[in-house]
């Protein structure tokens, strides 16, 4: 069994824990902070790897990006599509009572050339896979129909596909 994941809009997820409730406009000290590679597809590949299921994460970003070096550190196999841009950061602020405030950056802007390269990489790396999972939000420049169009292309080539995202159009 081999599962390929595509995370079109990966992130470096930073979680900051506060000792007092978040106060708008104030300077506050954190009592804890962690950062992890993120994005739904990345998270799926991490869970599969921990479970012993072969997986390959396809991630747009530079090979030296902290998200990709973090994936290397936890032995998640990946292939990257160079974008010339850093992978976005998402920030979660956790109040003492557990209330969370999330700030999600938009991600790398995709033009037609970058989209074509991503499509080609997904099709190329999916050869021999049992499943291809398209997961997470779409970055700027990829239309809401992107996943449904990629699913159609993958299914036409005989691949089993799954999509994990809210609001996917035309599936």
Regions found by a protein language model. Give the residues of each.
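Short, basic, glycine/proline-bearing loop/turn elements
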Residues: 27-32, 105-106, 135-136, 155
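Conserved beta-alpha-beta core of the PfkB/ribokinase-like small-molecule kinase fold
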Residues: 131-171
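Glycine-rich phosphate/adenosyl-contacting loop at the front of the ribokinase-like
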Residues: 1-56
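Short, acidic Gly/Pro/Ser/Thr-rich loop/turn segments
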Residues: 11-13, 98-101, 139
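General beta-strand structural signal in soluble alpha/beta enzymes
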Residues: 6-8, 59, 79-80, 133-134, ...
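Conserved N-terminal subdomain of the carbohydrate kinase-like
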Residues: 24-26, 49-129
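Short glycine-enriched loops at secondary-structure junctions
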Residues: 8-13, 84-88, 168-169
């Amino acid at each position: 069994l081999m599962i390929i994941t595509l995370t079109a809009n990966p992130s470096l997820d930073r979680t900051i824990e506060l000792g007092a409730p978040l106060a708008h406009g104030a300077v506050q000290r954190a009592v804890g902070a962690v950062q992890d590679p993120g994005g739904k597809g990345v998270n799926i590949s991490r869970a599969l790897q921990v479970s012993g299921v072969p997986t390959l994460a396809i991630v747009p970003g530079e090979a030296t990006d902290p998200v990709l070096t973090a994936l290397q550190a936890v032995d998640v196999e990946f292939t990257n599509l160079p974008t010339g841009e850093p992978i976005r950061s998402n920030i979660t602020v956790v109040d003492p009572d557990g209330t969370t405030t999330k700030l999600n950056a938009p991600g790398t802007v995709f033009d037609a050339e970058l989209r074509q390269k991503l499509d080609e990489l997904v099709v190329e790396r999916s050869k021999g896979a049992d499943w291809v999972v398209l997961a997470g939000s779409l970055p700027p420049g990829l239309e809401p129909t992107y996943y449904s169009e990629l699913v159609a292309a993958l299914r036409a080539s005989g691949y089993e596909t799954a999509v994990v995202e809210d609001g996917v159009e035309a599936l």
